[in-house]
C-alpha cells in the first residue's frame, strides 16, 4: 500500500494538487506518442467528496506548444462580440464571484461567451455586452 496521506475531504487546493500530479504522470505517455497534454481545469461534482479532472491532449503546434482550438476560435470571433483576442482567459468579477473567460460559441446568440467560475470551475454563459462591460469596469482604476 502507498505511503501517501489519506485524504478525507477534497478541498480546492487538494483537487489542484491531485490534478497536477496526474498531469505530470500523463505527460510521458503523451510525449511517447508525439502529443502534448495540458490541464483543462476540473470541476467539483460532490463538494468535498469527488471531482472531475479534465485534460486536453492535442497534436502540438509548430512551436511545440499545445494547440488550443478554443483560444484560436476566440481570437477569430472576439471582435464581432466587442471583445479582443487578448481577453481569452481574462478574469472578471460578477455578483461578487470571480470568473474566467473560456470561449465563444456563436451558436448561442443570446449568451455566446463561455466562462468558468474560478473557485469550483463550473461553467456559465454570459452575454457579450455584459462581459465587455465587466471587463471595462474592471480595467478602470
UniProtKB/Swiss-Prot annotation:
Keywords annotated in UniProt: Plasmid
Domain of life: Bacteria
Protein name: Uncharacterized protein y4mA
